[in-house]
């Protein structure tokens, strides 16, 4: 399927690559560009660069990148057409795509979209059933008594599933949706004896569950009558996977980046109340342990995570287990310890929003400080525990990435062992990896003073050892990229076969085709114009190559002369072979080389 180029251009112009990439990668400004951990491969040192000026991104580790379309294709594993549609929806530009024109893989994506559509459509009627029907009055009163205002209910899209086995089933069927697909989406259940379908959620308050893009992919149905289970969640489906979903991430992402911290709670009800109280960087898992997928996504946003679990034994055990794992994953871990037996919802209900935000602000501890405070009685009364936990806490502190945070932890933890911070520091067994990283490759790093060392410009590693001829080819191409007039003036000055670097030869050919369709060169359009990742990398590397703002007199002509020397050298080589053929008396070879020389001379005329 072909999409009108004007639509593609409009979407590209309205989509800022920095905003787009920032939804997936925590970026820091380094010079004119932004840099962060690559979302396409595992790495500890940032190698993913975004150029706001040029509207491109590139990883010089795994080499992936491009403009907004290529980034979306890679990050979502979708086709170009789907990427255009996705970004079009993002900037409110309509793109008409018929599902029948997709291949099988795209059809799968289309099924996923239909599942999301079903969830979002039924949400409107769940909300109506809660706020406008007699059957929903008891559920609405239950929410209001627990501090849910009309505005909060609307903001969160909370609804009510009537006590009917076919409300959702009939609603979707009347609108032409595939009932089997609704079952696969988790909205319906199935009787395995007669294969009849019925509503999964009945007589429950419905809380929509959204993915990172803010689309509804599941529900949590809460009882208000005391029936079990207390919460009934959507099952695992193609669009709803608990190990990948963090509740409220779509709303909290901007605050997480701004505050450089994420606060993890146990349940989504705690998140709603905490967010309402003013704590905007809060998320929760869906009743599961924090998964590797969760941690990978968190690391792209921030390296600082605060755990605020329930103030009971189970919450304490979960805090210790989760915090230890996060610390080993290279995150800075903090803990807010709620009063015994309380969760955030209960704390806010008892003391109010202001008291809660003040408590969160003032009661934050490092994970090491929290851990030692939990274990203090055992440390004080058991020598074996004293030795064991001294080693454990020393190791925990050694895992902290900031020397300032380490010193703070030493000061907090040392009194529990009746030693000085200096004595505790002596016990620390640092990891085998050196504390300071000295870059010896293209990935950049940090010097001995903690200062960041810029990696090489995007894609330039492959052009480290260029010959005099290749350097001329690179500079010549860079000038041709300035404007179309320069290209037209010099295009016929060189023979493409004279390029010794095949990458540069292909770029020369691409420029010819590109300028045939465009009046102005820009890298964002150029990388979209080609299909080869290798060629995209070459284009990006040339974009990063800096020349004088204006060429000096005859500069481009000098490059042309160097490039054309290859042609002259070829003639000299043919003359040498002709003389050798004459010396040995091979008439056929003499004739062949003479024809080659004549042809070469004609090319240069």
UniProtKB/Swiss-Prot annotation:
Pfam families: DnaG_cat_HB, DNAG_N, Toprim_2, Zn_ribbon_DnaG. A zinc finger (CHC2-type) spans 38-62. Keywords: DNA replication, DNA-binding, DNA-directed RNA polymerase, Magnesium, Metal-binding, Nucleotidyltransferase, Primosome, Transcription, Transferase, Zinc, Zinc-finger. The keyword Ribosomal protein does not apply. Disulfide bonds: none annotated. Transmembrane segments: none annotated. Its EC number is 2.7.7.101. Binds 1 zinc ion per monomer. It catalyses: ssDNA + n NTP = ssDNA/pppN(pN)n-1 hybrid + (n-1) diphosphate. Mg(2+) 1 binds at residues 266, 310. Residues 260-341 form the Toprim domain. Monomer. Interacts with DnaB. NCBIfam families: dnaG. Contains an N-terminal zinc-binding domain, a central core domain that contains the primase activity, and a C-terminal DnaB-binding domain. This is DNA primase. It comes from Staphylococcus aureus (strain MSSA476). The lineage of its organism: Bacteria, Bacillati, Bacillota, Bacilli, Bacillales. The gene is dnaG.
């Amino acid at each position: 399927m072909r999409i009108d180029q004007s639509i593609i251009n409009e979407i590209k112009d309205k989509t800022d690559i920095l905003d787009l990439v920032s939804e997936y990668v925590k970026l820091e400004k380094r010079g004119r560009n932004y840099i962060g951990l690559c979302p396409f491969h595992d790495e500890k040192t940032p190698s993913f660069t975004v150029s706001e000026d040029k509207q491109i991104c590139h990883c010089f580790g795994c080499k992936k990148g491009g403009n907004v379309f290529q980034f979306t294709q890679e990050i979502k594993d979708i086709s170009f057409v789907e990427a255009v549609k996705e970004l079009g929806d993002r900037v409110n530009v309509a793109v008409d795509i018929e599902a029948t024109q997709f291949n099988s893989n795209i059809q799968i994506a289309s099924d996923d979209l239909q599942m999301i559509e079903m969830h979002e459509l039924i949400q409107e009627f769940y909300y109506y059933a809660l706020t406008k029907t007699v059957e929903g009055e008891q559920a609405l009163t239950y929410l209001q008594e627990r501090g849910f205002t009309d505005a909060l209910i609307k903001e969160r899209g909370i609804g009510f599933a009537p006590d009917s086995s076919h409300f959702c089933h009939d609603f979707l069927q009347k609108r032409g949706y595939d009932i089997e697909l609704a079952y696969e989406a988790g909205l319906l259940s199935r009787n395995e004896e007669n294969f009849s379908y019925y509503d999964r959620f009945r007589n429950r308050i419905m809380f929509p569950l959204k993915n990172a893009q803010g689309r509804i992919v599941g529900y949590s149905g809460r009882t208000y009558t005391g029936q079990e289970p207390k919460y009934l969640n959507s099952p695992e489906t193609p669009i709803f996977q608990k190990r990948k979903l963090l509740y409220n991430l779509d709303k909290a992402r901007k605050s997480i980046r701004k505050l450089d911290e994420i606060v993890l709670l146990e349940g989504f009800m705690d998140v709603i109340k905490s967010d309402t109280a003013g704590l905007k960087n809060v998320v929760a898992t869906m009743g599961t342990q924090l998964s590797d997928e969760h941690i990978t996504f968190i690391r792209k946003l921030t390296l600082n995570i605060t755990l605020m679990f329930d103030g009971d034994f189970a919450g304490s055990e979960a805090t210790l287990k989760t915090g230890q794992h996060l610390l080993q994953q290279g995150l800075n871990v903090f803990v807010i310890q709620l009063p015994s037996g309380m969760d955030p919802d209960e704390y806010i209900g008892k003391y109010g929003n202001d008291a809660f935000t003040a408590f969160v602000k003032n009661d934050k501890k490092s994970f090491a400080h929290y851990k030692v405070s939990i274990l203090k009685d055992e440390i004080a009364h058991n020598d074996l525990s004293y030795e064991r936990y001294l080693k454990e806490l020393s190791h925990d502190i050694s895992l902290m990435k900031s020397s300032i945070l380490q010193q703070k932890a030493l000061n907090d933890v040392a009194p529990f062992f009746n030693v000085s911070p200096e004595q505790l520091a002596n016990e620390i067994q640092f990891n085998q990896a050196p504390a300071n990283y000295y870059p010896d490759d293209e990935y950049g790093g940090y010097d001995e003073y903690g200062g960041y060392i810029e990696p090489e410009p995007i894609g330039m590693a492959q052009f480290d050892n260029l010959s005099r001829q290749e350097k001329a080819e690179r500079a010549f191409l860079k000038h041709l990229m300035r404007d179309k007039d320069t290209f037209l003036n010099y295009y016929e000055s060189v023979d493409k076969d004279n390029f010794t670097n095949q990458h540069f030869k292909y770029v020369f050919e691409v420029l010819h085709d590109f300028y045939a369709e465009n009046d102005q060169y820009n890298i964002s359009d150029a990388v979209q114009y080609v299909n080869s990742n290798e060629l995209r990398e070459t284009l990006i590397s040339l974009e990063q190559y800096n020349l004088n703002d204006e060429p000096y007199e005859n500069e481009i002509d000098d490059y042309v002369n160097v490039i054309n020397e290859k042609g002259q050298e070829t003639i000299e080589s043919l003359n040498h072979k002709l003389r050798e053929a004459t010396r040995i008396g091979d008439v056929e070879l003499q004739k062949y080389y003479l024809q080659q020389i004549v042809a070469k001379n004609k090319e240069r005329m």
